[in-house]
Swiss-Prot record:
Source organism of the structure: Spermophilus variegatus
The encoding gene: MT-CYB
PANTHER family recorded: CYTOCHROME B (PTHR19271:SF16)
Localization, UniProt: Mitochondrion inner membrane
InterPro entries (alphabetical): Cyt_b/b6_C (IPR005798), Cyt_b/b6_C_sf (IPR036150), Cyt_b/b6_N (IPR005797), Cytb/b6-like_sf (IPR027387), Cytochrome_b (IPR030689), Cytochrome_b_C_euk/bac (IPR048260), Cytochrome_b_N_euk/bac (IPR048259), Di-haem_cyt_TM (IPR016174)
PROSITE patterns per UniProt: CYTB_CTER, CYTB_NTER
Keyword Membrane: yes
Complex formation: The cytochrome bc1 complex contains 11 subunits: 3 respiratory subunits (MT-CYB, CYC1 and UQCRFS1), 2 core proteins (UQCRC1 and UQCRC2) and 6 low-molecular weight proteins (UQCRH/QCR6, UQCRB/QCR7, UQCRQ/QCR8, UQCR10/QCR9, UQCR11/QCR10 and a cleavage product of UQCRFS1). This cytochrome bc1 complex then forms a dimer.
Name of this chain's protein: Cytochrome b
Transmembrane segments: 33-53, 77-98, 113-133, 178-198, 226-246, 288-308, 320-340, 347-367
Function according to Swiss-Prot or TrEMBL: Component of the ubiquinol-cytochrome c reductase complex (complex III or cytochrome b-c1 complex) that is part of the mitochondrial respiratory chain. The b-c1 complex mediates electron transfer from ubiquinol to cytochrome c. Contributes to the generation of a proton gradient across the mitochondrial membrane that is then used for ATP synthesis.
Gene Ontology cellular-component terms listed: mitochondrial inner membrane; respiratory chain complex III
Main location: mitochondrion
Cofactor note: Binds 2 heme b groups non-covalently.
Length: 379
């Protein structure tokens, strides 16, 4: 008798996706982050669901309801901090996952890559709206500043901002709709993840060498299921150390002050995972220019397949490209640091130089270095 997992319509899909999936035998730990992102999404949906049971999306009671969750709800403090810090873990995994894709040339599977970038955008939007919900000072002012950027769009900008706000300022209507969107988007993300996997399984996984690995495939289970479980345990370990020992390490102390439209915090800044883009935004002294640079800093990922001029897919055997890749990583870390600093000398200059370097490496240096490597290898 044939195994049920190979005949049952539903089990067959699961079997082809997670059990009998032919997988390259040499994929490294850098390929673990896909499953870790799935774990983060699951944690976020579950903890978010329980938080939504006690949260009230109203300007008068939002802050108090979060306090109530932390003080009165059974293990509410734990659920809240797991939710807040899992968001950080989510973005750490996202950045490493995208970085892996850039390093090993995974963007050559452009359908999978493009869906991945759409996912990145939607996750960023979800995280931004979630940050507004506790209705602390940084929630309110972050929402005001970031949504106000849309007013830079010519002609329709101001109308668009007021339409998003549901009034003439960030208020009850804004909070209510942000809560609604924050609730629905993770399910849209889940659907996009399924499409992401669908396209990935059309081609099969890339591998560190960037070479075709059809001649050397192994089943996903048990080899990579065990490997993914190890990764998941390590992620949960790091997350729980963060949650139980320093839950506010990555948050902003200003968010423990209830939102006050009459008092502006000295330094308005988003969560740490948006700081690199925020630094690029601030480095341009023109509003529309800044917004375009901000959007371009993420959208530029879409043109990586077009900028790939090397004859080799992966950077594994390309030392010059490797060097430039790590310079790009260092540049992004510099931008993240600058994004959290006040707007004054020397931070303004460092931010501008780092922003220029970011776009120069991607648009000019990496393609040029690829051509040099082709020449050196006489290809």
């Amino acid at each position: 008798m044939t195994n049920i997992r190979k005949t049952h319509p539903l089990m067959k899909i699961i079997n082809h996706s997670f059990i009998d999936l032919p997988t390259p035998s040499n994929i490294s730990t850098w390929w673990n982050f896909g499953s870790l992102l799935g774990l983060c999404l699951t944690i976020q949906i579950l903890t978010g669901l329980f938080l939504a049971m006690h949260y009230t999306p109203d300007t008068v009671t939002a802050f108090s309801s979060v306090t109530h969750i932390c003080r009165d709800v059974n293990y509410g403090w734990l659920i809240r901090y797991i939710h807040a810090n899992s968001a950080s873990m989510f973005f750490i995994c996202l950045f490493l996952h995208v970085g892996r894709g850039l390093y090993y040339g995974s963007y050559i599977y452009f359908e999978t890559w493009n869906i991945g970038i759409i996912l990145l955008f939607v996750v960023m939007a979800t995280a931004f709206m979630g940050y507004v919900l506790p209705w602390g000072q940084m929630s309110f002012w972050g929402a005001t500043v970031i949504t106000n950027l849309l007013s830079a769009i010519p002609y329709i900008g101001t109308t668009l901002v007021e339409w998003i706000w549901g009034g003439f300022s960030v208020d009850k209507a804004t909070l209510t709709r942000f809560f609604a969107f924050h609730f629905i988007l993770p399910f849209i993300i889940t659907a996009l993840v399924m499409i992401h996997l669908l396209f990935l399984h059309e081609t099969g996984s890339n591998n560190p060498s960037g070479l075709v690995s059809d001649s050397d495939k192994i089943p996903f289970h048990p080899y990579y299921t065990i490997k993914d479980i190890l990764g998941a345990l390590l992620l949960i370990l790091v997350l729980m150390i963060l949650v139980l020992f320093s839950p506010d390490l990555l948050g902003d102390p200003d968010n423990y002050t209830p939102a006050n439209p009459l008092s502006t915090p000295p330094h308005i800044k988003p969560e740490w995972y948006f700081l690199f883009a925020y630094a690029i935004l601030r480095s341009i002294p023109n509003k529309l220019g800044g917004v375009l640079a901000l959007v371009s800093s993420i959208l530029i990922l879409l043109i990586f397949p077009l900028l790939h001029l090397s004859k080799q897919r992966s950077m594994m055997f390309r030392p010059l490209s490797q060097l430039m890749f790590w310079v790009l990583v260092a540049d992004l870390l510099t931008l993240t640091w600058i994004g959290g600093q006040p707007v004054e000398y020397p931070f303004i200059t460092i931010g501008q130089l780092a922003s220029i370097l970011y776009f120069t490496i991607i648009l000019l240096i990496l393609p040029a270095v690829s051509l040099i490597e082709n020449k050196l290898l006489k290809w």
